[in-house]
C-alpha cells in the first residue's frame, strides 16, 4: 500500500503540491488525471523519491520513502516513461535488461538476453527483434519494448507516464489493454498519469483528479461519469467553462 499524507512541494515561490492525501491499495490500478501543470509528474517523482517534498509523508508498504538510500528501494519499481526513453545505442535486449545488468539483481548477459525474449512475448512481440536497435522499430513497437523493460525486474509497483502519447488510436488501445492485462496478471500496484480518458477507462480500478495541488476527487472508475464533482465533469467532457477554466 502507498499512503501520502499532506504532501507539499514548491519550486521557489511556485506552489505545485499543496497538501496531497492519497491512498493506493496494493494490487490496484490508480489513474491520476488532471490538466497540464497540475503537478502529476512532480507527484510521481515525490513517490519515487526523485524529488524531495517540503512537507508531509509518503509511505510505501509502511516504510517511509525518505529511506531511499536503502539499496533495494528502487528494485521494487518499474517505470514506463512518456517518450519510451529507450537507449538508441544498444540493442533491444539490452534496453529491456538494462537495470538487471547493472543493479542489485545483476545477472549474466546470456540470462539477460533470455529474460528479454520472455518479456517481449508478454507484450506481444516476437523475440526475433532482440538484436535490433530502437530506431529500427515503429513507435508502437518501441512503446511495447519500453513496457517490457518496465516489467523486466518483476516490480511490485509500476508507474506509467502518459503511456499513449504519440500513438495512433489503434496502437493506443493496444497499449492500454496490454497494460491492463499485465497489471492484472502480475498482481502489481499501478499508478498512471494521463490526459487520455479512454486510457483511464481501460486501465483504472480507481481514479484521482489532481488540481490546484490537491486531490479534488477519488473514486472507482465506474463512478467517474457520475462523480458529482464539477471539476471532474468538466475535465472528462472537455468543457471550456467550469471551475478549472480560469486556471489555464
Regions found by a protein language model. Name each.
Residues 48:
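Helix-to-loop junction immediately C-terminal to a conserved catalytic motif
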Residues 56-65:
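Conserved ABC transporter NBD signature motif
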Residues 65-78, 224-227:
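ABC ATPase NBD coupling module
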Residues 109-128:
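Conserved ABC ATPase "signature" region
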Residues 133-137, 141:
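Conserved ABC ATPase signature
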Residues 154:
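Conserved catalytic motifs of ABC-family nucleotide-binding domains
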Residues 158-161:
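Catalytic Walker B motif of ABC-type/P-loop ATPase nucleotide-binding domains
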